[in-house]
Amino acid sequence: MKAVSPVRPSGRKAPSGCGGGELALRCLAEHGHSLGGSAAAAAAAAAARCKAAEAAADEPALCLQCDMNDCYSRLRRLVPTIPPNKKVSKVEILQHVIDYILDLQLALETHPALLRQPPPPAPPHHPAGTCPAAPPRTPLTALNTDPAGAVNKQGDSILCR
């Protein structure tokens, strides 16, 4: 996952610190569809953090820390195995994320629709410089046949890219 943060050339200072309050708001507005109803609160919080970082002398480091803390809080909201009302460290958040990804991978590997398909044949050897044709993919509609199992809340989309 890549963080959704503005990238600026190193050695150049942002016009108004931490990417600027306007830039943080624009960045959040671009991804507002995935923030659900808390878009205004998240935008205000990000702008406040960026304005606080603006006053500090070590601006680039604080901007990076601001971006990283935003991504950790997004991960905390997105991963369902993290207890919502318990303080967890960044390492614990990453451990929960890794476990959640492994659980999702296992669920994909053991999905009944995928088990019914015969294994793909071994790809033939192609000479260097040529690309083999991609194997056909299983349509998502075939995998998502259980509507009761697919619960999609408005705030459940990935924010960091």
From Swiss-Prot:
Pfam families (UniProt xref): HLH
PANTHER family in alphabetical order: DNA-BINDING PROTEIN INHIBITOR, DNA-BINDING PROTEIN INHIBITOR ID-4
Tree of life domain: Eukaryota
Name of the protein this chain belongs to: DNA-binding protein inhibitor ID-4
Region (Disordered) residue spans: 117-161
Annotated localization: Nucleus
Molecular function (Gene Ontology), one example: transcription regulator inhibitor activity
Gene Ontology biological process terms in this record: astrocyte differentiation; central nervous system myelination; cerebral cortex neuron differentiation; circadian rhythm; fat cell differentiation; G1/S transition of mitotic cell cycle; hippocampus development; negative regulation of astrocyte differentiation
Keywords on record: Nucleus, Repressor, Transcription, Transcription regulation
Residue ranges of the TM segments: none
Domain bHLH: 52-104
Species assigned in the record: Homo sapiens (Human)
Subunit structure: Heterodimer with other HLH proteins.
Function: Transcriptional regulator (lacking a basic DNA binding domain) which negatively regulates the basic helix-loop-helix (bHLH) transcription factors by forming heterodimers and inhibiting their DNA binding and transcriptional activity. Implicated in regulating a variety of cellular processes, including cellular growth, senescence, differentiation, apoptosis, angiogenesis, and neoplastic transformation.
Lineage, top ranks: Eukaryota, Metazoa, Chordata, Craniata, Vertebrata
InterPro entries: bHLH_dom, DNA-bd_prot-inh, HLH_DNA-bd_sf
